Regions:
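RNase H-like, Mg2+-dependent phosphodiesterase core
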Residues: 1-245
Length: 245
């Protein structure tokens, strides 16, 4: 069986980081290619949705499997305060692997999230329960989603799950959010509604440079920090703001 793992949403200031994993029969990659599977960034939203729906219709008894692991902004912020984003992704890739229904005779290809692809593999596998799995091997490659259809499929699953999370957030706050990436004009505009003097929305990555810069330019006082209780003055300000609204 072939397994692909990839992520979506490492760089955005809004929403989760999502890791996708999929498993297909050894001879299925030509079929994936024929269905238009390629790096999710090169596909329209409509095409990604069509491919995702098709994938989930494939017979699980033949080994087809796919799922995602979502890492919320709070967890991302705490990771930035600790070991960093690379280790967070290592943990996420491990978690994704543990969802696989079969753990033998697998060739696993991951899109490397570390400048050292071999190190990325080693960090993942050293924490995977029971590794090495019988008859299995794992490699990590840079731009694997461009060269391995099974990894491209994983990227599509991850991207679609992240898009759903962003849509849910947009509906909750009542504004358009764009892609969530700092360079997106719609995302930039949305920050005015998400980063308030009284607090920052939980689906914003508080530790991102974009947030720090916005706070410095448009808000006063110290930037809130995840896990640090706000001051009495901030709490009173929030209460006053609530009464005004």
């Amino acid at each position: 069986m072939l397994v692909g793992i990839d992520e979506a949403g490492r760089g955005p200031v809004l929403g989760p980081l999502v890791i996708g994993i999929c498993c297909v029969p050894d001879d299925a990659e030509p079929l994936l290619t024929s269905k238009g599977v390629k790096d999710s960034k090169d596909l329209s939203p409509k095409k990604r949705q069509e491919i995702e729906a098709w994938f989930h219709q494939q017979p699980t008894e033949d080994g087809w499997f796919g799922t995602t692991v979502s890492i919320d902004p709070e967890t991302i912020d705490f990771a930035l305060q600790d070991q960093g984003l690379n280790w967070l992704e290592v943990d996420g890739f491990r978690e994704a692997m543990m969802h696989l229904p079969h753990r033998k005779h697998l060739r696993i290809v991951a899109d490397a999230c570390d400048v050292n692809a071999q190190r990325f593999t080693e960090r993942i596998t050293e924490g995977v329960s029971g590794w090495p799995w019988k008859g299995s091997e794992m490699v990590s490659e840079h731009k694997a989603d461009e060269h391995h259809p099974v990894v491209s499929m994983a990227s599509i699953l991850a991207k679609e799950e992240r898009d759903r999370a962003m849509q849910a957030m947009s509906e909750r706050v009542g504004i358009q959010l764009g892609s969530g990436y700092p360079a997106d004009p719609t995302t930039k505009t949305s920050l005015e509604h998400l980063i308030l003097q009284s607090g920052i929305d939980e689906q914003v990555r508080w530790g991102w440079a974009t947030v720090k810069r916005f706070w410095k330019e448009h808000r006063t006082g110290d930037l809130p920090v995840r896990g640090v209780q706000r001051t009495i003055q901030q709490q009173l300000f929030h209460e006053d703001e609530s009464r005004i609204s």
